[in-house]
């Protein structure tokens, strides 16, 4: 999922290989579509989407970034990161941030072959990144739209990374002191 930034390139390449004509930066009027309709069976309107920052009261000096900026590596993250929204993208970005600074497969292989650390230490290095991550979801369930066959493993890995998961919790305000949330237990920062 981390390589989602390459999905667009892959889709474009695959479509072109299949002979799909891709027209960019052109307004498709109803007349254009009707006039050309004899040439194809279907029209796909891929209008795209733009991420938005929810209207949460916040101190403007507190940096807020989009999930896609995190995936693309352009977001500057602090030591403590709160992900607002526990849908599919929110959970995956929380897991991605939680993975930053953990051992890679090659590093683990090397360390196991040469027995550089005890097993317990290797587990710790695999499961604790450099960021403290929390994810806040208003609803009762995290990532409800992820395929059930893979959802459990994504949620399990997110928890394994030590991501604090708050469901049925609302973000009230973002301040310099932290993110103020509210749930049945009351307000907390």
Language model region names:
Residues 1-40, 144-169:
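N-terminal Rossmann-like dinucleotide/flavin-binding domain of flavoprotein oxidoreductases
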Residues 23-35, 46-63, 68-146, 180-189:
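Rossmann-like dinucleotide/flavin-binding elements
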């Amino acid at each position: 999922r981390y390589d989602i930034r390459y999905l667009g390139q892959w889709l474009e390449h695959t479509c072109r290989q299949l002979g799909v004509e891709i027209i960019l930066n052109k307004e498709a009027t109803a007349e254009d579509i009707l006039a050309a309709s004899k040439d194809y069976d279907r029209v796909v309107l891929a209008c795209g989407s733009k991420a938005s920052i929810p209207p949460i009261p916040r101190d403007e000096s507190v940096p807020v970034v989009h999930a896609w900026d995190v995936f693309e590596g352009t977001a500057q993250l602090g030591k403590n990161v709160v992900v607002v929204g526990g849908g599919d993208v929110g959970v995956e970005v929380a897991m991605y941030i939680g993975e930053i600074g953990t051992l890679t497969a090659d590093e683990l292989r090397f360390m196991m072959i040469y027995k550089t650390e005890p097993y317990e230490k290797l587990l710790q290095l695999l499961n604790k990144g450099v960021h403290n991550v929390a994810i806040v979801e208003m609803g009762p369930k995290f990532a409800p739209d992820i395929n059930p066959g893979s959802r459990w493993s994504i949620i399990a890995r997110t928890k394994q990374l030590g991501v604090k998961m708050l469901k049925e919790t609302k973000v009230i305000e973002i301040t310099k002191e932290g993110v103020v949330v509210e749930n049945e237990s009351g307000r907390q920062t």
